[in-house]
């Protein structure tokens, strides 16, 4: 057995990447996200401080469309990098015996709530998460979408569970829980919310609770 942790830097800033990925997203076809000028009128000062100052600068400079293009181009480049890794796996003898987890550490605002991360709103806390378990390991060959809220803290106990490894002596001290049941059946009952904490070094600490229906920010 082997474990490969492959970190792809993009689409994190700076967006330095081959021009062909920008060409995949022509400026004239870029759709800007909805932005309300009064969006922050009903939130406390702490919430306003969370919002990146870059949002106003980018819009005022007239480069909002270019900023969205850069983010899309960087995501396309990262997608191509992931493709190279998956192609190599398919050519290997391990393709049908390897669990694949694709995830991002945070979301990103491109104008909805100003710009960047460093906040607890939906755009910045909702991350990509795809888990593939081969049929030989009990996985479901049909791709399915799960709407249950989960946390990145759940990945470690989930991999332990999916690999059939015994729980460690410290498993009871983990903050996350295995979501293997959701991987096998996305509709299984799941009463647990996702808990998000914003770094105390960035205008915090602040916390959020995300259930399937509600998103509460404190």
Predicted regions and their residues:
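Active-site-proximal cap/lid insertion segments
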Residues: 1, 5-149, 162-171, 217-218
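C-terminal cap/loop subdomain of S1 sulfatases and analogous C-terminal strand-loop tails that border
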Residues: 106-112, 141, 153-156, 161-218
């Amino acid at each position: 057995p082997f474990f490969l942790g492959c970190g792809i830097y993009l689409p994190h800033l700076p967006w330095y990447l081959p021009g062909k990925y920008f060409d995949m997203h022509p400026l004239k076809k870029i759709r800007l996200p909805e932005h309300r000028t009064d969006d922050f009128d009903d939130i406390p000062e702490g919430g306003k401080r969370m919002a990146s100052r870059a949002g106003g600068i980018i819009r005022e400079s007239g480069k909002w469309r270019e900023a969205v293009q850069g983010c899309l181009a960087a995501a396309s480049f990262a997608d191509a990098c992931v493709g190279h890794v998956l192609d190599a796996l398919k050519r290997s003898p391990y393709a049908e015996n390897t669990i694949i987890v694709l995830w991002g550490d945070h979301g990103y605002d491109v104008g909805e709530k100003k710009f960047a991360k460093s906040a607890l709103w939906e755009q910045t806390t909702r991350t990509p998460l795809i888990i593939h378990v081969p049929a030989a390991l009990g996985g479901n060959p049909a791709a399915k979408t799960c709407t249950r809220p989960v946390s990145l803290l759940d990945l470690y106990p989930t991999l332990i569970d999916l690999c059939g490894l015994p729980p460690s002596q410290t498993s009871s001290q983990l903050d996350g829980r295995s979501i293997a049941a959701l991987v096998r059946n996305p509709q299984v009952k799941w009463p647990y919310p996702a808990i998000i904490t914003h770094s105390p070094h960035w205008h915090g600490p602040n916390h959020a609770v995300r259930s399937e229906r509600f998103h509460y920010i404190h």
